[in-house]
Regions:
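Glycine-rich beta-strand-to-loop/alpha-helix junction loops that act as flexible
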Residues: 100-102, 246-251
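Short, well-structured alpha-helical segments that form the helix of a local strand-helix-strand
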Residues: 122-133, 214, 264-267
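Short, basic/glycine-rich phosphate-binding loops at helix/coil junctions
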Residues: 48-60, 109, 131, 204-214
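DPxDG-like acidic metal-binding loop motif
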Residues: 97-123, 139-141
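ATP-binding N-lobe of GHMP and related small-molecule kinases
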Residues: 1-97, 115-124, 161-162, 170-173
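Conserved, helical-rich catalytic subdomain that frames metal- and/or nucleotide-binding sites
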Residues: 142, 147-243, 258-287
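Short hydrophobic/aromatic beta-strand micro-patches
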Residues: 254-256
C-alpha cells in the first residue's frame, strides 16, 4: 500500500532574530507561509530496513538521513518496531534555498506514517516528533499562515494570506545558515519587521499592508559576495511586485504579485538568468 503526501515549501513573510539563547538556539519571531511549490513523498511498506530513493537514486541509509531519524522517532513514539519502508522523494523545491524543502520532506513522511500507522495521533505530538529532528518542522506539519516563535516551535495560526501570486527566484549559490547567524549575533539590525502590523493586515485581508511589511533581518547581515540577492529583489520590484524579500537564510528571494499576468511575466523574465525561478500560490493549512 502506497501513501503519498505533498511537501510544500515555505517562505518567511517576516523574520526577526530576538537573540541567542543559553541552549545555543536563537529566539525567533516569524510569520511563515506555505506555498504551492512542493516535493512529493511516497511511502510503501516494502524491502528490507529503511530505503530512501530521491528522484530514482537510492540515498544510503544511516543515521545521517533526517528521514530515517524521523521515522525511528515516530515508531518509538507509537511503541512499535519500524517496518521495512521505502520512501520515494520527487524533488521540485531547490535545496539550500531558505525554503524549508528538506524539513517539508521529512514532515510529509511523518504525515504519511501517521495516516498509515497512527491516524489518532494528535497533531501536537506529530509536531513534537518533528522538533526532535529540526526547528522548521513543527510549522511544516500544519503549514498555512502562522506566527512562529521560540526556535520556531511555538505556533499561532493566522488568517490566510490574501489571494496573490508569488514568484520565487534562487540564485546559483547557497548561503551557510550558521555563518549568517554568527554575523547577526555580532550586530544589531537597523530595521526590524512590524510583525504585529502584518498580523493586523492579514486580519483585514489587506494584501498591500502585508506586502509593505515584508522584512527579513538576515538581509542586513549578508556578506558582499551574496549581494546578488538585492539585485533580484530590485528586479522583482521593477517587474511589478508589490514588494520582495529574502526567505529564511536565503538565498531565495520572493516577490508578491496581485495579478497572475504580471507574476507570470516576471517568472519568464527572471528565468532567463536564474533557471531556479518558480511561480507559486499561497497554500492553506495541511492538517
Amino acid at each position: 500500500m502506497k501513501i503519498q503526501e505533498q511537501a510544500p515549501a515555505k517562505i518567511n513573510l517576516a523574520l526577526n532574530i530576538l537573540g541567542r539563547r543559553t541552549d545555543g538556539y536563537h529566539e525567533l519571531r516569524m510569520v511563515m507561509q506555505s506555498v504551492s511549490l512542493c516535493d512529493t513523498v511516497t511511502v510503501e511498506e516494502t524491502g528490507i530496513g529503511f530505503a530512501l530513493l530521491a528522484d530514482g537514486f537510492t540515498v544510503p541509509a544511516g543515521k545521517s538521513s533526517l528521514e530515517q531519524q524521523a521515522a525511528e522517532a515516530f515508531f518509538a513514539a507509537v511503541g512499535r518496531p519500524m517496518p521495512p519502508l521505502t520512501v520515494h522523494l520527487e524533488k521540485t523545491t531547490p535545496a539550500y534555498a531558505g525554503l524549508g524543502g528538506g524539513s517539508a520532506d521529512v514532515v510529509a513522511l511523518l504525515r504519511c506514517l501517521r495516516r498509515r500507522y497512527a491516524p489518532e495521533m494528535p497533531v501536537e505530538q506529530l509536531r513534537a516528533i518533528g522538533l526532535t529532528v529540526g526547528s522548521d518542522m513543527p510549522f511544516c506539519v500544519s503549514g498555512g499562515t502562522a506566527l512562529a516563535e521560540g526556535r520556531g516551535e511555538r505556533l499561532t495560526a493566522l488568517p490566510a494570506l490574501p489571494d496573490c501570486w508569488i514568484v520565487l527566484c534562487k540564485p546559483e549559490f547557497g548561503i551557510p545558515t550558521p555563518a549568517l547567524f554568527t554575523l547577526a549575533d555580532a550586530g544589531t539590525p537597523k530595521n526590524r519587521p512590524d510583525i504585529d502590523g502584518m498580523i493586523r493586515a492579514l486580519s483585514a485581508e489587506d494584501l498591500n499592508g502585508v506586502a509593505a511589511r515584508l522584512c527579513n533581518v538576515f538581509e542586513e547581515f549578508l556578506p558582499e559576495e551574496y549581494h546578488e540577492v538585492f539585485h533580484i529583489k530590485n528586479r522583482l520590484l521593477e517587474l511589478g511586485a508589490l514588494n520582495a524579500a529574502m526567505s529564511g537564510s536565503g538565498p531565495t528571494v520572493f516577490g508578491i504579485f496581485r495579478e497572475k499576468t504580471a507574476a507570470k511575466a516576471a517568472e519568464t523574465a527572471l528565468k532567463q538568468c536564474y533557471p531556479q525561478t518558480y511561480l507559486a500560490k499561497p497554500v492553506g493549512e495541511l492538517v
